[in-house]
Amino acid sequence: NLSDDLSFNFDKFVPNQKNIIFQGDASVSTKGVLEVTKVSKPTTRSIGRALYAAPIQIWDSITGKVASFATSFSFVVKDEPDEKIDGVDGLAFFLAPANSQIPSGSSAGMFGLFCSSNDSKSSNQIIAVEFDSYFGKTYNPWDPDFKHIGIDVNSIKSIKTVKDDWRNGEVADVVITYRAPTKSLTVSLSYPSDGTSNIVTASSVDLKAILPEWVSVGFSGGVGNAAKFDHDVLSWYFTSNLEANQSQT
């Protein structure tokens, strides 16, 4: 009998971490940091993903229940002082079909989630929150003209964004909540160093219409042409609860 509640917590990580599936260049350092993309030079075109090993039931076709969930994590993105490119390309938290794999051609601004042949297709069945540290119309024409937090549904072109000035080497704390009754997804990012925070909310995000019943959750990241650029997750908490959908349609 599966419980309607699920939660897990990683205060830190260990090499060859149990309960985490590593894809591409993702790994855990001896310092207990989840390194989503390649660390050793060159990091150019590195892609990595780290997923919680157990699939999570996000809705139930029999009972009609849809999960509310919350996740919190701390991360750092950093490049070397002599790096000529400012921020390439970013980190994302995502939900995707269980046992999902990295698509071919999804490095750089595609975050290891999408590629040109599948972008915007409902068959992707992906919801992601991207922390995009690079913008440039030449390479990423879908992006707004600023570094940002974006909520993505089946496409690298975000449905909602808010400006966020990426800070090289600084810890960022993130809280993401989804409320099933209101179908609202809210993202809050704050910098403990000075308390600055940004919030973005998307309404009418219908998990049942977008995702399969069972999903994998985790992190993905991509690097473009930067020779040395790191995406590090320091800690991660996740909890979900299947509940009867109270909203009437």
Curated annotation (Swiss-Prot):
<feature type="glycosylation site" description="N-linked (GlcNAc...) asparagine">
    <location>
        <position position="245"/>
    </location>
</feature>
<dbReference type="InterPro" id="IPR000985">
    <property type="entry name" value="Lectin_LegA_CS"/>
</dbReference>
<feature type="binding site">
    <location>
        <position position="132"/>
    </location>
    <ligand>
        <name>Mn(2+)</name>
    </ligand>
</feature>
<keyword id="KW-0430">Lectin</keyword>
<feature type="binding site">
    <location>
        <position position="130"/>
    </location>
    <ligand>
        <name>Mn(2+)</name>
    </ligand>
</feature>
<dbReference type="InterPro" id="IPR013320">
    <property type="entry name" value="ConA-like_dom_sf"/>
</dbReference>
<dbReference type="Pfam" id="PF00139">
    <property type="entry name" value="Lectin_legB"/>
</dbReference>
<feature type="binding site">
    <location>
        <position position="145"/>
    </location>
    <ligand>
        <name>Mn(2+)</name>
    </ligand>
</feature>
<feature type="binding site">
    <location>
        <position position="148"/>
    </location>
    <ligand>
        <name>Mn(2+)</name>
    </ligand>
</feature>
<dbReference type="InterPro" id="IPR050258">
    <property type="entry name" value="Leguminous_Lectin"/>
</dbReference>
<comment type="function">
    <text>Di-N-acetylchitobiose specific lectin.</text>
</comment>
<keyword id="KW-0479">Metal-binding</keyword>
<dbReference type="InterPro" id="IPR019825">
    <property type="entry name" value="Lectin_legB_Mn/Ca_BS"/>
</dbReference>
<dbReference type="GO" id="GO:0046872">
    <property type="term" value="F:metal ion binding"/>
</dbReference>
<keyword id="KW-0106">Calcium</keyword>
<keyword id="KW-0464">Manganese</keyword>
<feature type="binding site">
    <location>
        <position position="140"/>
    </location>
    <ligand>
        <name>Ca(2+)</name>
    </ligand>
</feature>
<feature type="binding site">
    <location>
        <position position="132"/>
    </location>
    <ligand>
        <name>Ca(2+)</name>
    </ligand>
</feature>
<feature type="binding site">
    <location>
        <position position="134"/>
    </location>
    <ligand>
        <name>Ca(2+)</name>
    </ligand>
</feature>
<protein>
    <recommendedName>
        <fullName>Anti-H(O) lectin 2</fullName>
    </recommendedName>
</protein>
<dbReference type="InterPro" id="IPR001220">
    <property type="entry name" value="Legume_lectin_dom"/>
</dbReference>
<dbReference type="InterPro" id="IPR016363">
    <property type="entry name" value="L-lectin"/>
</dbReference>
<dbReference type="GO" id="GO:0030246">
    <property type="term" value="F:carbohydrate binding"/>
</dbReference>
<comment type="similarity">
    <text>Belongs to the leguminous lectin family.</text>
</comment>
<feature type="binding site">
    <location>
        <position position="145"/>
    </location>
    <ligand>
        <name>Ca(2+)</name>
    </ligand>
</feature>
<keyword id="KW-0325">Glycoprotein</keyword>
<feature type="glycosylation site" description="N-linked (GlcNAc...) asparagine">
    <location>
        <position position="118"/>
    </location>
</feature>
